[in-house]
């Protein structure tokens, strides 16, 4: 019984432990291509192509249509006009299949920005945006990537509340310094 209790405590501690964005500011952002959806229409997203237009806000979220992820997508959708004025592209990434993201991009992203499917966790793992080594879902991690392909901001927090605000501040700071 004591062993079972200890195992349960360890499991709870591991699940409660925060994930950390381990790609640091200044690191080279891993390039990727992924199937994405915007306004319910699928397309192939390329980070390299997006960076030619300006900075990219890349945010990872655990799962479409869950409470926190829905509210986070709503927040990014509301801020898209401001991100666009700064020349920034926003893309969300999760493990969800593309058909689920077709619906999510229409309803929760309000057809304002794309979301990409990373069903094999290749992108999440390359950005150290997973909860643990055997995790299927992404940690809630946001990056701002400069047009040169460098990480200029990284933030991990399971609470969705500040991801939009903090990435907006980072984009504003980057744009101001680039002038």
Protein language model annotation of sequence segments:
Residues 1-9:
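Bacterial N-terminal signal peptides that target proteins for export
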Residues 6, 13-36:
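N-proximal helix/coil linker or "cap" segments that precede and/or mark the start of modular domains
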Residues 30, 55, 139-141:
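Short loop/turn microsegments at loop-to-beta-strand junctions
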Residues 33-55:
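A short beta-strand-turn-helix
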Residues 47-70:
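Short active-site neighborhood of thiol/selenol oxidoreductases, capturing the structured segment around
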Residues 70-109, 121-123:
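Structural microenvironment flanking redox-active thiols in thiol-disulfide oxidoreductases
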Residues 111-113, 131-143:
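Structural micro-motif
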Residues 137-179:
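Thiol-/selenol-based redox modules, centered on thioredoxin-like
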